Amino acid sequence: MSVDELAREQAILDAAAELLCRIGYNKLTMGDVAEAVALHRGLVYLQFKSKDELVEATVRRELGRYARAWRAHLLADPHAGSVASVYRAMVHTLSRLPLAAAIVARDPDILGKYPAKPGNVFERLANTGTRDFLRAMQAAGTLRPEVDVRTTAYILDALTPAIRRTLPIGDAAPADPERPSADQLLETLADLLERALTPDGADLARGKTLLLDELAHAHAEFDATPNRQEGTLS
């Protein structure tokens, strides 16, 4: 792919990301994207043969950014290696990446009917989630051995949309004054997770190393974009 083609692809992905956040998957059209980047619709189809292929590429790129930012925060956190450190990094990162926050929370306003479509990108990224992080930490001894990883992952994933609702993202309405801020929620959640899941004397350095390895694996999955064929307007 030439430099011009790479630049065009990134411009298309930038436009798709902005439009997903603004109007959502259900209303998004390839024509909208073409108009946003001032290209003929046919040139957009030369890069991505369908709307779903474009959305997949946009999701993969955003999750790659999410993984890189998450990794940077873990590297800078002297207490990284516990479950709580994962959530400290998650909240810090999602508050800065609104599309990633919508993707992680499977926000129906943004993703619409896409996650229910057969062959969607989330089906192929099913193994790069919370359960993998918990298994890595249990193997490192930074998660209590008696913890049921599958159930804990399910509970923590269910909390993600609630966490996201506390984040000041985009043009969202002011938060309910009775609702805790992201910092307050994170402080309480981190304390609960540390008390319930982290064993005494845990080797956080080892946990941090394994977490970074898991993130590297996830990043590779996000970057493994399927080969695309030249699209048509039909």
PLM region spans:
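Helix-turn-helix
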Residues: 11, 19-53, 57
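Short amphipathic alpha-helical elements of helix-turn-helix/winged-helix folds
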Residues: 15-19, 93, 159
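Amphipathic alpha-helical packing segments from all-alpha helical-bundle domains
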Residues: 113-142, 147-165, 184-187, 191
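C-terminal peripheral helix-coil segments that are non-catalytic and often amphipathic
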Residues: 128-140, 165, 169-234
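Hydrophobic alpha-helical connector segments
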Residues: 57, 68-102, 106, 149, ...
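Generic hydrophobic, amphipathic alpha-helix propensity
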Residues: 8-16, 33-34, 54, 58-66, ...
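Helical hydrophobic small-molecule/effector-binding pocket
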Residues: 84-106, 120-132, 157, 164, ...
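Short linear capping/connector segments at secondary-structure termini
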Residues: 104-113, 173
